[in-house]
């Protein structure tokens, strides 16, 4: 499978998750679960309440994928738009 075909499969897979996305509200009660074994380190969640495992380059981030936060040195960048016009975002070098 060439890189273009892999990219198309990637977008198709991402669309499946995007359709099942439900945006989370910020309810900062500070009763956070401890994080461990984070491949890309840790970061504060989108509300600034709890430490969470960060995601790495090429991973989905932002509200598209459970409000995932990019690792240090990366930024959550717009990749395109889903069917409902919401932005698809992935972690890229800052």
UniProtKB/Swiss-Prot annotation:
Protein species of origin: Lychas mucronatus
Free-text tissue specificity from the UniProt record: Expressed by the venom gland.
Domain IGFBP N-terminal: 23-94
Gene Ontology CC terms: extracellular region
Subcellular location: Secreted
Signal peptide range: 1-22
Keywords recorded for this protein, A-Z: Disulfide bond, Secreted, Signal
Name of the protein: Venom protein 59.1
Paired cysteines (S-S): 19-47, 26-49, 32-50, 38-53, 61-76, 70-91
Lineage of source species: Eukaryota, Metazoa, Ecdysozoa, Arthropoda, Chelicerata
